From Swiss-Prot:
Subunit record text: Part of the 30S ribosomal subunit.
Protein name: Small ribosomal subunit protein uS11c
Keywords, comma-separated and alphabetical: Chloroplast, Plastid, Ribonucleoprotein, Ribosomal protein, RNA-binding, rRNA-binding
Protein family: Belongs to the universal ribosomal protein uS11 family.
Amino acid sequence: MAKQIRKIGVRKTKRKIPKGVVHVQATFNNTIVTITDVRGEVLSWSSAGACGFKGTKKGTPFAAQTAAENAVRQVIDQGMKQAEIMISGPGSGRETAIRAIQAAGLGITLIRDVTPIPHNGCRPPKKRRV
């Protein structure tokens, strides 16, 4: 009979995280919600695609709402009460994601738009001709 292997090392303890940062990346095709602690370590994430939406439905406001609710539900179980929101991108799920975060019971202390805007940097892609 094989010897039983003893586990060496310390198990990760569940930390109580009272304050965090919610990063919402809203593109035209998808919405990704990532929740970190104040140091930047990821606690939970969700996206419209991970919630079961496919194709063009991923870019809808309802998909963004569902993704935000799923991500927030996990961190509320870990004890988070307040969060700052960093929102980036031009997508249609921006406002809906913020409303969903607030409705899920997470207190919002700050909303900051961190959408990168070039100071006339790279040449944009040519316009579509449909």
